[in-house]
Design a protein with these regions (language model features):
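N-terminal phosphate-binding loop and adjacent alpha-helix
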Residues: 1-28, 183
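Gly/Thr-rich phosphate-binding beta-strand-loop-beta motif of the actin/hexokinase/Hsp70
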Residues: 1-4, 35-42, 138-179, 184
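Active-site neighborhood for divalent-cation/phosphate handling
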Residues: 36-140
Length: 184
């Protein structure tokens, strides 16, 4: 569904009612009914970073990530939501560590999606970031060789490098299809 003009700015849904109406029209046209919605967010304001942490139990990872978030991202953590994905266990200087992909997204970005769900009369099942959603699909589809996966989106490009089915690098580049179209 193409977003109506100026509804979506840097990942924030600015005109919830206009976008909700456009989505409802398409849902009605296709007789699509739902109770839940899952969002996969793409925003130039979303930051990701690979992080190595000590090998701790799974239930301790979140507290460790939250406690060290300001070291990963130099922003006011009161305005951000921090999430992570476990990539793999690695050995670093003779010690077993856990490699994570940590994401920081402004709370206002996530809250705008909850507002859209409310306007649509839907319950949010989960919110993910586009890089992780793509990672979950790609890791099942590529082999053990080094693979470069490039996702060109409207406002940005996500570059993923895999080795042995493990994400080694993921970067968001703020150049996408819209820039190419405008250049032509």
């Amino acid at each position: 569904i193409p977003a109506p003009e100026d509804c979506y700015v840097d990942g924030v849904i600015e005109q919830t009612d206009v976008l909700a109406k456009a989505i409802k029209v398409v849902m009605d046209e296709h007789r699509f009914n739902a109770n839940n919605v899952a969002f996969s967010i793409s925003s130039p304001r979303l930051a990701t970073k690979e992080v190595l942490i000590p090998n701790v139990k799974a239930n301790k990872i979140d507290k460790l990530v939250q406690a060290n978030a300001t070291e990963y991202f130099p922003v006011n953590m009161d305005e951000y939501i921090i999430q992570y994905t476990v990539l793999e266990k690695v050995e670093d200087q003779g010690q077993e560590k856990i490699k994570l992909m940590v994401a920081a997204v402004p709370s206002e970005v996530v809250e705008s999606y909850y507002g859209l769900a409310k306007a649509l009369g839907l319950k949010v099942a989960f919110v993910d970031y586009a890089g992780n959603s793509s990672y979950q699909i790609m890791k099942q589809q590529i082999g053990p060789e080094v693979s470069l996966v490039i996702q060109v989106e409207n406002d940005g490009t996500v570059i993923n490098i895999f080795k042995d089915n493990v994400l080694q690098l993921q970067r968001n580049v703020p150049y996408g299809k819209s820039m190419l179209v405008n250049a032509v």
